[in-house]
From Swiss-Prot:
Region entry Leucine repeat II (LRII), spans: 237-269
Annotated Pfam families: GRAS
Stated family: Belongs to the GRAS family.
Leucine repeat I (LRI), as annotated region: 84-140
Gene Ontology biological process terms in this record: gibberellic acid mediated signaling pathway; regulation of DNA-templated transcription
Motif (VHIID): 189-193
Biased composition (Low complexity): 458-485
Protein name listed in UniProt: Protein SLENDER RICE1-LIKE 1
């Protein structure tokens, strides 16, 4: 394998009457009686069953191809008109909500429910309209709070979304390629994952490092995730699976979990950065959840300060290319409606099988839609922002952009080409990559480093309180950061 080339390995998903009997109907009467009604009076001894079909009951000729195409085009046009009307009804409802007109919003919502019947559920706008109509209903008529989705349920839906479409695979591949290139020539490397989930991203990186000319480095992974409500150390479970893989490909490996309800609870000392190791931070669809209303102090600042203080070799950031952090409800609703319509269209095209897998992937997206539509203030977490705004924010935090090379662009296009659907495209913009659908960017990937020195090895890192990188101090009890549910150290796995 060529140096710094990431392998494609993803271990771990109407002639209706034509059938009538020709002797079934008698011929019509030749003479009409005075009452104006035609009667048939067969001659004596005539075999009624042997009579030929009357001319008017002959089989209809099949539709000409041009006529069938015209009918299909007319139906599509009718559905398109119905879809446009439904979109206008949903936007009118959102506008009435923003204006505080509950009665008008309720009437528009009722019309939206009725209009859904005229839109095909197989179309992107038809499926997404169901979710937005449901979300508007929940906002207008709040019901008793349902139990929140458990982490296990979220992980289940996340896995189906991963399998159904190219977006998360694109995110993992692009980030891993940048990390692999940043670690070139480094003997001790440390990846800090802001959202470990099931660890789906890391088997491919471990395999790529195993194939590195000159031998693999010593790899540490610190995985951050929420505390388990059952008390089971799920982070450690993921670490054990990764350790088994690393052992099988002869990569020296250490894993450590850090449990935190929010990323701003994590402090640099909890990461146990070791002197001399090259550090990479990785964030896939996480940073937008740290944003807040303009009047509030957002947790994003503390997290970016933490990243900058460590001075990493690379900081990979994948985010939705959307603007769902607007203060005006109608603007936010409109942007989300068209964004998710494109995502649903692409999801349908990417998955040839459809079925339950697609339904679970859509359920994953439905949670985001409900948060954007129903949530306000601190209750709203899905605050997606476009790449241009992330550039400004990350630059202010003391980070510099690292261009994603032509190699990453070429291989990302190859990866996306493995999925069905010709509408997907990967484009490069100012050193960043975007994955879009029919020309609309939907996800962006960028890479960053500490400004000034381009990042580097942590030879004199003042935030580290541990020398070495064995990660063998399992079950340490980390200090709370002043919150009642502060971050804590998790178990470690070492090879």
């Amino acid at each position: 394998m060529a140096m710094d080339t990431f392998p494609f390995q993803w271990p771990m998903d109407p002639a209706a009457s034509s059938g009538l009997d020709a002797g079934f109907l008698p011929p019509p009467a030749a003479v009409a009686p005075d009452d104006g009604v035609g009667y048939y009076d067969p001659p004596a001894g005539a075999d009624v069953d042997a009579a030929a079909l009357p001319e008017f009951a002959a089989a209809f000729p099949p539709c000409a191809p041009d006529a069938a195409a015209a009918v299909l085009a007319m139906r599509r046009e009718e559905e398109e008109v119905a879809g446009i009307r439904l979109v206008h009804l949903l936007m009118s409802c959102a506008g009435a909500i923003e204006a505080g007109d509950h009665a008008l919003a309720s009437a528009q919502l009722a019309d939206s429910h009725a209009a859904l019947a005229a839109v095909s559920a197989a179309s992107g706008i038809g499926r997404v309209a169901v979710h937005f109509t449901t979300a508007l209903s929940r906002r207008l008529f709040p019901s008793p709070v349902a139990p929140p989705t458990t982490d296990a349920e979220h992980a289940f839906l996340y896995h189906h979304f991963y399998e159904a479409c190219p977006y998360l695979k694109f995110a993992h591949f692009t980030a891993n390629q940048a990390i692999l290139e940043a670690f070139h020539g480094c003997d001790h490397v440390h990846v800090i994952d802001f959202s470990l989930m099931q660890g789906l991203q890391w088997p491919a990186l471990i395999q790529a490092l195993a194939l590195r000319p000159g031998g693999p480095p010593f790899l540490r992974i610190t995985g951050i995730g929420p505390p388990s409500p059952t008390g089971r150390d799920e982070l450690r479970d993921v670490g054990l699976r990764l350790a088994d893989l690393a052992r099988s490909v002869r990569v020296r490996f250490s894993f450590r979990g850090v449990a935190a309800n929010s990323l701003d609870e994590v402090r640099p000392w909890m990461l146990q950065i070791a002197p001399g190791e090259a550090v990479a931070f990785n964030s896939v669809l996480q940073l937008h959840r740290l944003l807040g209303d303009p009047a509030d102090q957002a947790p994003i600042d503390a997290v970016l300060d933490c990243v900058a203080s460590v001075r990493p070799k690379i900081f990979t950031v994948i985010e939705q290319e959307a603007d769902h952090n607007k203060t005006g409800f109608l603007d936010r609703f409109t942007e989300a409606l068209f964004y998710y319509s494109a995502v649903f269209d692409s999801l349908d095209a990417a998955s040839a099988s459809g079925g339950a897998g697609n339904a679970m992937a859509e359920a994953y997206l439905q949670r985001e839609i409900c948060d954007i539509v129903c949530g306000e203030g601190a209750a709203r977490r899905e605050r997606h922002e476009p790449l241009s705004r992330w550039r400004d924010r990350l630059t202010r935090a003391g980070l510099s952009a690292v261009p994603l090379g032509s190699n990453a662009l070429r291989q990302a296009r190859m990866l996306v080409g493995l999925f069905s659907g010709e509408g997907h495209s990967v484009e490069e913009a100012d050193g960043c990559l975007t994955l879009g659908w029919h020309g609309r960017p939907l996800f962006s990937a960028s890479a960053w480093e500490a400004a000034g020195d381009g990042g580097g090895d942590n030879n004199n890192n003042s935030n580290s309180n541990v020398s070495g990188s064995s990660g063998s101090d399992s079950n340490n009890s980390g200090s709370s950061n002043g919150k009642s549910s502060g971050a804590r150290d998790g178990s470690s796995v070492c090879l």
